[in-house]
Structures are given as C-alpha cells and as structure tokens.
Curated annotation (Swiss-Prot):
One of its GO terms (cellular component) is myofilament. GO terms for biological process: in utero embryonic development. Gene3D superfamilies: Immunoglobulins. It is found in: Cytoplasm, Myofibril, Sarcomere. Disulfide bonds join 282-333. This is Myosin-binding protein H-like.
C-alpha cells in the first residue's frame, strides 16, 4: 500500500485545514513535483470571541439598598480566551477593605458585606481581551432613615385649629424625602394620633381640636426607609378655650291667659230619694282662679252644714247630705273673678219612697 501524501498545492495558493489539531502542525512531506522554493503550509490561530457583558435587567436602573444590607452582584460576560475583568468605583480603584471581587471564566461577582452610604456611586465593569473591551455601568444607592426636622413652631391658635411651621431635616438619608407625618397629643391622655401623612409642605393647619384640651404636636420626616427615628415637639401648647357666649334675649310680649269664668260642663237635672246623699257636678274655666258660690232658689247656702262644696282643678261639686222633701228646688253654681262671672242652674227633685 502506498503511503498517504499531502495534496499538491499550486504556488501562490493557501491550504485551510478544518478542525486542526497540534499534530497537524508538523510540516507535510513535499511531493516529488514540488519545487524547493515553495511556501510551507502553517496552522491558523483560533478565532477570538469578542468580549461582551450581559447586564441583568434589574441593574439597568439604580440599585437601591439600605445601610447594613449585603450587596452581592453577579455579572455574566463572554470572551474567549478568558478576558480580564476590572472594577472601578466612581472612576477609582475599589477599596479592597470593604469591597471584594471574584472573577470567574464567564462572570464577575461584586460583594459588599455591610453596605454603607459611602458605598453609593457609579460602579463600572470593564472586560478586556486583547485590544477589545466591553463596559457596563451600575449605579448603587445606599440609603437610611432621614434625620428629624430641625425645629417645629406653634404659630397661631384660633377657634378649633392650630397653625404649625417647621424646617426640613439636614440629613435626608441619601435620598429624596417622601413627605412629613404630623401627629398631635392632648395633655390628658398623652397618646399620639396622626393627623397628616405624606405631607409635602413645611407648614400646616391642624383642625377639629376639642374645646377644653391642650395639645402638643410633633413632625416626622419620611423617605423610602421609613420615618425618622425622632421628631421635634412643640415647646408651646395649643390651648383650645371655650369662647364666651353672649346671649341677647329678644323682647317678647307675655301671653295673657286671663279670662272670665266659663262653664265647660253645666249642671244636670236630677231626681233623688229621701235619705240618700246626692252630688251635683259642673266644670268651669277661668283665670285668675274664680270664687265658687252655690245657691238654692237664689239663696246662698255657703256655710250650711247640710251641704258640702268642693272645687279641684276646675271641677265643682256640691254634696246634699240625706236630702228631705224640702231640699228640692233650683240649684245654682256661680263663678266670679275680676274679669266677670258665670253661672249654671239645675233642678233637683226629692221623692218620698212609698
């Protein structure tokens, strides 16, 4: 069997070997027809993979953490052969005492065990491979609770309301304020109640205060981390006093209830039997209270022990005790007051039993 030989290559042409191996780098034997001055075939170097960074979507916006939180960012990249990954913070080298970096074959990890506000800033990752380079920028913001407003002042108290003013805090917690929370407390209970939340101005009016109470006020600043740990309290109390009410009485005419006597229920005729007590009734209305006079056959019988006269709430009664045949006749009840008089009559018949 003849030995395998390399194919002949014309002068000035190229030979491309696919899937080359280190063994292929040995120079092939020249064919008998190949001249002494022909070029020797060489193995081409592998094509490099350009460096590229795959930045996670969550890191394309500002990455916000609270003071004391852990920052652990894994950034994948590509490049062949293995590229060189370099981190910077605001254009300067990282502080290795606080920030640690681990670079792998296809990713780089940025780790901060306990983030502080000084760790905020712009972090840049550069992946270099030969003369090629890819960069990615990550903005990290480390925030904490804001400081309290610098002061609070009770400006005015009127009616059921009080006006407050305060100044913004010096420290906003490394982020924008979301507003203020205003609370009130009366001196009787000492309990704090929120009256305003997420309030953006530095002055407000607190209404619906209760008469007779004294109030203190305090204001918290608020950001993404929450309310400030402390709040200033007004030194002056708001005393809600009851306004003196002056009543002006209007003159009015006193109603005159005076009237002359008038019988609303007259006497009724009756027939009785000898020896049985008999009562006569009538009703009268008058003001002032009238004087009641009883008559028999137009003769005054006041003071006669045979008769008993009573008057109560305008009801007049006359009791005839054990009437006899001579007690029959015309009985009259007369009512008299300064405005006039009135009278009613009835007939009483006394029968003797058989």
């Amino acid at each position: 069997m003849e030995a395998a030989t390399a194919p002949e290559v014309a002068a000035g042409s190229k030979l491309k070997v696919k899937e080359a191996s280190p063994a292929d780098a040995e120079p092939p034997q020249a064919s008998p027809g190949q001249g002494a001055g022909s070029p020797t075939p060489q193995l081409l170097p592998p094509i490099e993979e350009h460096p590229k960074i795959w930045l996670p979507r969550a890191l394309r916006q500002t990455y916000i953490r609270k003071v004391g939180d852990t920052v652990n960012l894994l950034i994948p990249f590509q490049g062949k052969p293995k590229p060189q990954a370099i981190w910077t913070h605001d254009g300067c080298a990282l502080d290795t005492r606080r920030v640690s970096v681990r670079n792998g074959e296809q990713d780089s990890i940025l780790f901060i065990r306990e983030a502080q506000r000084a760790d905020s800033g712009r972090y840049q990752l550069r992946v270099q491979l030969g003369g090629l380079e890819a960069t990615a920028t990550i903005d990290i913001l480390v925030i904490e609770r804001p400081g309290p407003p610098q002061s609070i002042k009770l400006v005015d108290v009127w009616g059921f309301s009080a006006t407050l003013e305060w100044t913004p805090p010096q420290d906003t917690g490394n982020t924008a304020l979301l507003g203020y929370t205003v609370q009130k407390a009366d001196t009787k209970s000492g309990l704090w109640f929120t009256v305003l939340e997420h309030y953006h101005r530095t002055s407000c009016i607190v209404s619906d205060l209760i008469i007779g109470n004294s109030y203190a006020f305090r204001v918290f600043a608020e950001n993404q981390c929450g309310l400030s740990e402390t709040a200033p309290i007004t030194t002056d109390l708001a005393h809600i006093q009851k306004a003196a009410t002056v009543y002006k009485t209007k003159g009015f005419a006193q109603r005159d209830f005076s009237e002359a006597p008038k019988f609303t229920q007259p006497l009724a005729d009756c027939t009785t039997v000898t020896g049985y007590n008999t009562q006569l009734f009538c009703c009268v209305r008058a003001s002032p209270r009238p004087k009641i006079i009883w008559l028999k056959n137009k003769m005054d019988i006041q003071g006669n022990p045979k008769y008993r006269a009573l008057t109560h709430l305008g009801i007049c009664s006359l009791e005839i005790r054990k009437p006899g045949p001579f007690d029959g006749g015309i009985y009259t009840c007369k009512a008299v007051n300064p405005l006039g008089e009135a009278s009613v009559d009835c007939r009483v018949d006394v029968k003797v039993p058989n």
